């Protein structure tokens, strides 16, 4: 069966213009206009998605099948083009019968054209085919528009769902344009309103605990590189070669479709001298569909600039991914559980804003893993927030899992974060020695987020930095009173 893409090529129907009109209409819809005004950070993210929409629409039109009736009419039209005028006169009754049988829009006009002329001349033969072709172009264009309208409705529905999700989560997870873009990419999954409301709930809890939020931000900045510029900078001349498009074309670079009369191909120019094809020539001229030579040129020139010689002293500490281990023992339930989950959500926000990865591991009697910064990050975050903290404490397994992850090339510069009350048994000597080796040889940093003032000092001594957030009633009341 004939595909719509083939039909468009046969009739020189440009679907690109139709696709662009549809996308412009979609972006100008009232729903998107209101959304862009409310969430300006997400506007750029949605705009960056336009090439994907355009490619999906092209594939849809390319794979679409033409209805059998229109296919049969197109085949008949192609066969009629090969007939001479005497042959066309003989075949005309069968052609008219076929058009009526197929309910072609051209059938009635074709009969009127034939009835209005007693003799079928060569000119009438050409006119008949030209008008028939125009009818086929109209039918093909209508079919393109119908398919694009269906796709527009489906695309608008998808975008509205993603806008609802992104709009709810943008205040919680999007701290800048980078985070907004990654959040929009994550919203492509199949999520229901009740699912992502869990993220909203913990986001609101995090806003109620500004000290916890600040703690996460301090931890995220703890590896920020420092640079000290010198003030005695001198100017130096710097030369480079730059390539620029030439003002005068130099050579033929190929063929293109345009309305440039001066660079027409000879076959195109020949059609202008044929009376029967003159109308076709002007139509293609208006639509910029004439085949012309493409001329390009380029030139190189030397560009001289002066720039200061800047010397800086760097204390380089790259900000890598987060590997977060969360204690899910029974002692971490209740308010501790809420704080641990909200803290991980704050780290996810930092990771999205700074284009870092955030990997969560829950440790008790077994290790459960989630990556909150991947393409399925929102779904992974929802699964993590749905977990209940009712297991045991196995810090040794937690550290072994972290060390195994740090040996991977993609995690070599990661920050390891352990969230616990640290009320547990002492670590085995082999684990302690391995952690110290990673700290000494590979400069890995281990952070402890202590949720209790009663954590064992012997366990916590192994960490590079201890971030304390006491969740006891006295500390909670003091924090609330200070606000």
UniProtKB/Swiss-Prot annotation:
InterPro entries: Uncharacterised_CoxE, Uncharacterised_ViaA, VWF_A, vWFA_dom_sf. Belongs to the ViaA family. PANTHER family: PROTEIN VIAA. It is found in: Cytoplasm. This is Regulatory protein ViaA. It comes from the Bacteria. Keywords: Chaperone, Cytoplasm.
């Amino acid at each position: 069966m004939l595909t719509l893409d083939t039909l468009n090529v046969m009739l020189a129907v440009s679907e690109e213009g139709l696709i662009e009109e549809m996308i412009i209409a979609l972006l100008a819809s009232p729903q998107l206009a209101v959304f862009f005004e409310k969430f300006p950070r997400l506007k750029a993210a949605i705009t960056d998605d336009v090439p994907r929409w355009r490619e999906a629409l092209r594939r849809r039109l390319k794979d679409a099948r033409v209805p059998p009736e229109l296919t049969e009419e197109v085949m008949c039209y192609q066969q009629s083009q090969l007939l001479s005028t005497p042959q066309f006169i003989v075949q005309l009754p069968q052609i008219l019968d076929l058009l009526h049988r197929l309910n072609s829009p051209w059938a009635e006009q074709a009969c009127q054209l034939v009835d209005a002329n007693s003799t079928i001349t060569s000119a009438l033969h050409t006119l008949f085919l030209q008008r028939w072709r125009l009818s086929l172009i109209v039918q093909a264009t209508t079919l393109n528009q119908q398919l694009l309208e269906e796709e527009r409705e489906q695309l608008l529905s998808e975008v509205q769902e993603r806008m609802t999700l992104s709009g709810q989560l943008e205040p919680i997870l999007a701290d800048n344009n980078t985070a907004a873009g990654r959040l929009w990419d994550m919203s492509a999954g199949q999520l229901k309103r009740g699912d992502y409301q869990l993220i909203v709930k913990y986001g609101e809890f995090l806003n109620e605990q500004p000290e916890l939020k600040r703690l996460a931000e301090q931890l995220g900045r703890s590896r920020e590189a420092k640079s000290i510029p010198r003030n005695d900078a001198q100017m130096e001349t710097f030369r480079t070669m730059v390539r620029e498009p030439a003002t005068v074309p130099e050579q033929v670079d190929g063929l293109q479709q345009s309305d440039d009369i001066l660079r027409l191909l000879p076959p195109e120019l020949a059609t202008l001298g044929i009376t029967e094809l003159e109308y076709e020539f002007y139509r293609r001229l208006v639509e910029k569909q004439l085949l012309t030579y493409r001329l390009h040129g380029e030139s190189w020139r030397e560009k001289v600039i002066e720039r200061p010689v800047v010397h800086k002293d760097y204390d380089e500490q790259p900000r890598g991914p987060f590997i977060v281990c969360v204690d899910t023992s029974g002692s971490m339930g209740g308010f501790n559980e809420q704080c641990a989950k909200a803290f991980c959500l704050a780290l996810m926000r930092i990771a999205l804003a700074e284009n870092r990865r955030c990997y969560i591991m829950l440790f008790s009697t077994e290790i459960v893993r989630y990556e909150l910064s991947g393409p399925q990050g929102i779904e992974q975050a929802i699964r993590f927030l749905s977990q209940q903290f009712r297991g045991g404490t196995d810090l040794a397994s937690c550290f072994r899992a972290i060390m195994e992850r740090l040996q991977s090339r993609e995690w070599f510069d990661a920050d390891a974060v352990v969230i616990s009350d640290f009320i547990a048994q002492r670590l085995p000597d082999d684990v302690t020695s391995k952690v110290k080796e990673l700290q000494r040889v590979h400069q890995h940093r281990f952070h402890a987020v202590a949720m209790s003032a009663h954590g064992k000092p012997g366990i916590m001594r192994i960490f590079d930095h201890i971030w304390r957030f006491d969740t006891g009633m006295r500390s909670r009341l003091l924090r609330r009173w200070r606000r």
